[in-house]
UniProtKB/Swiss-Prot annotation:
Belongs to the heat shock protein 70 family. This is Chaperone protein DnaK. NCBIfam families: PRK00290.1 (NF001413), prok_dnaK (TIGR02350). The modification Phosphothreonine is found at residue 173. InterPro entries: ATPase_NBD, Chaperone_DnaK, Heat_shock_70_CS, HSP70_C_sf, HSP70_peptide-bd_sf, Hsp_70_fam. It comes from the Bacteria. Residues 596-613 have a biased composition (Acidic residues). Induction: By stress conditions e.g. heat shock. Residues 577-591 have a biased composition (Low complexity). One of its GO terms (molecular function) is ATP binding. Acts as a chaperone. Residues 577-613 are annotated as: Disordered.
Length: 613
């Protein structure tokens, strides 16, 4: 069975890992980094992903970051006249991760386990699965990020029973999960979180502060300047990271904008105390979900054996201090918060392929599922924190006499009224025979698979007629749309590959021109004028071809010049060998004059040499 890669598709950064020799290993990207910024840029029809796109963001307005925040919504990004869904942008990132994983492994990769925040709803999970499909990946499993982290942490600790709290504060989402580890079983007891809290929000607090300070000092509002905002965003992220290690950092952005008197510069010293003050409300928002997870698991803080930190934002000292205060224990520092999720996903891939044995993962659904009933009430069928996969049915009836159809409004959430919860979908069970209100028996069955994706079925028990749907939100893509996006992604991948090959061809040709100039200089006066002219003519032809976009011509001229260069190199080698031989001969001639004693053989050679002369 081919390898299944593990992917942490993050808001800010993404990572990919694979199981090798029973151990999960992070695959470095082409730049050598172990995580890749979740940033996509478009420029003149070309796509850039990762660090390259992030660096160019200051000057390229067609740059998209933190797209994960929009998964499962109708959000569209319009770039160069084309609309992109969050699934398509995520697929571009996945495609990049897939491509360098293939380079590392030396084989095609078409299967993956992708992680999502535990608190992602059905629409967001479905969107993630669709993104994988568009990228050419068969998503074997969608796994919750805290659960993946626990897998990576607990793989070598299955001998002892432990209760673990995973505190996952990433770039855009926050989750807390409580798991029980023992005898190779990873059982999730509860999960809670906030899908709109993460490192990006901490950055924004710094940006808002810098904008306010600059306006106060200079009377200029930087929030209206796109390029200045991008520079502020980069500076804020760097300052946040710096303040995890030092108590004060200098933010210096020369020529940030221009005023009436000329260029203006931003110089601000940000202390950790000020940063903590600015972000206090964000840190406080992590407490309620932590308490909720403990309450749902029927545990107190003292029952927790180990606290695992996941996500780069858990490096913020105030966050660590809050966890310590809330749970009464020092968080475990033995895992890399940026890499542990992808590693856990790779381990789950190993469980699927059979490379990892005796490990059972029992995950839960993060939110209650139900339907709208009379009076606009949400009636739950599956309570939150139910172990998945699972299915549950309940029988309902009609609300009016001779009601011909029943509308099934599928909901996800914890609020008592239907309107306050997330609508997953609607469908209708029609052709119900005329009967008094309350007589027809309508069975509604909810089924949640191992990926947390929901199917709902409604059946008229009297007639046996049934209707079912795999839940897709209003933002969900149709199979046709996904197929078209898959084809577009494949075409783009082919184009990207071609562009890369053409860039390499151009670089090699440039290098060859440089080599020819160097070689001709070294051979000056040592080879025929005819040879020199031939090489120069071929070089000039290649330089001319390099001015255009005809890559076949560049290839042809490169090959011709290469052949000439090889012949010249042979001549250069022969020339050097001849000179060395001549030098050796000269030493031999001088030897009899310098030495009093020479052996007969040596003298004989000299005599021959003299005779030859």
């Amino acid at each position: 069975m081919s390898k299944i890669i593990g992917i942490d598709l993050g808001t800010t950064n993404s990572a990919v890992a694979v199981l090798e020799g029973g151990e999960a290993k992070i695959i470095p990207n082409p730049e050598g980094a172990r995580t890749t910024p979740s940033v996509v840029g478009f420029k003149n029809g070309e796509r850039q992903v990762g660090e390259v796109a992030k660096r160019a963001a200051i000057t390229n307005p067609n740059t998209i970051s933190s797209i994960k925040r929009y998964m499962g919504t109708n959000h569209k990004e319009t770039i160069e006249g084309k609309d992109y869904s969050p699934q398509e942008i995520s697929a571009i990132i996945l495609q990049y991760l897939k491509s360098y994983a293939e380079d590392y492994l030396g084989e095609t990769v078409d299967k993956a386990v992708i992680t999502v925040p535990a608190y992602f709803n059905d629409a967001q999970r479905q969107a993630t699965k669709d993104a994988g499909k568009i990228a050419g990946l068969e998503v074997e499993r969608i796994i919750n990020e805290p659960t993946a982290a626990a897998l990576a942490y607990g793989m070598d600790k299955t001998e002892t029973d432990q209760t673990i709290l995973v505190f996952d504060l990433g770039g855009g989402t926050f989750d807390v999960s409580i798991l029980e580890l023992g005898d190779g079983v990873f059982e999730v007891h509860s999960t809670a979180g906030d899908n709109e809290l993460g490192g990006d929000d901490f950055d924004k607090k710094i940006i808002d502060y810098l904008v306010a300070e600059f306006k106060k000092d200079n009377g200029v509002d930087l929030s209206q300047d796109k390029m200045a905002l991008q520079r502020l965003k980069d500076a804020a992220e760097k300052a946040k990271k710096d303040l995890s290690g030092v108590t004060s950092t200098q933010i210096s952005l020369p020529f940030i904008t221009a005023g009436e008197a000329g260029p203006l510069h931003l110089e601000v010293t940000l202390t950790r105390a000020k940063f903590d003050e600015l972000t206090h409300d964000l840190v406080e928002r992590t407490i309620a979900p932590t308490r909720q997870a403990l309450k749902d698991a029927n545990l107190s803080a003292s029952d927790i054996d180990q606290v695992i930190l996941v996500g780069g934002s858990t490096r913020i000292p105030a966050v660590q201090e809050t966890i310590k205060k809330e749970l009464g224990k020092e968080p475990h520092k033995g895992v890399n918060p940026d890499e542990v999720v992808a590693m856990g996903a790779a381990i789950q891939g190993g469980v699927i392929t059979g490379d990892v044995k005796d490990v059972v993962l029992l995950d839960v659904t993060p939110l209650s599922l139900g339907i709208e009933t009379m009076g606009g009430v949400m009636t739950p069928l599956i309570e939150r924190n139910t172990t998945i996969p699972t299915s549950k049915s309940q029988t309902f009836s009609t609300a009016a006499d001779n009601q011909p159809a029943v509308d099934i409004h599928v909901l996800q959430g914890e609020r008592p009224m239907a309107k306050d919860n997330k609508t997953l979908g609607r469908f209708q069970l029609a052709d119900i025979p005329p009967a008094p209100r309350g007589i027809p028996q309508i069975e509604v069955l909810f089924d949640i698979d191992k990926n947390g994706i929901v199917t709902v079925r409604a059946k008229d028990l009297g007639t046996g007629k049934e209707q079912n749907i795999v839940i897709k939100s209003s933002s969900g893509l149709t199979d046709e749309e996904i197929e078209k996006m898959v084809q577009d992604a494949e075409a783009n991948a082919e184009e990207d590959k071609k562009n890369k090959e053409n860039a390499e061809l151009r670089n090699n040709a440039d290098q060859l021109v440089f080599t020819v100039d160097k070689t001709l200089k070294e051979l000056e006066g040592k080879i025929d004028e005819e040879e020199v002219k031939k090489a120069e003519a071929a070089r000039d032809e290649l330089q001319e071809a390099l001015k255009g976009e005809d890559f076949d011509a560049i290839k042809e001229k490169t090959e011709s010049l290469n052949e000439i260069v090889q012949n010249l190199s042979v001549k250069l080698y022969e020339q050097a060998a001849a000179e060395q031989q001549a030098a050796g001969g000269a030493e031999g001639q001088e030897a009899p004059q310098n030495d009093d004693v020479v052996d007969a053989e040596f003298e004989e050679v000299n005599d021959d040499d003299k005779e030859n002369k």
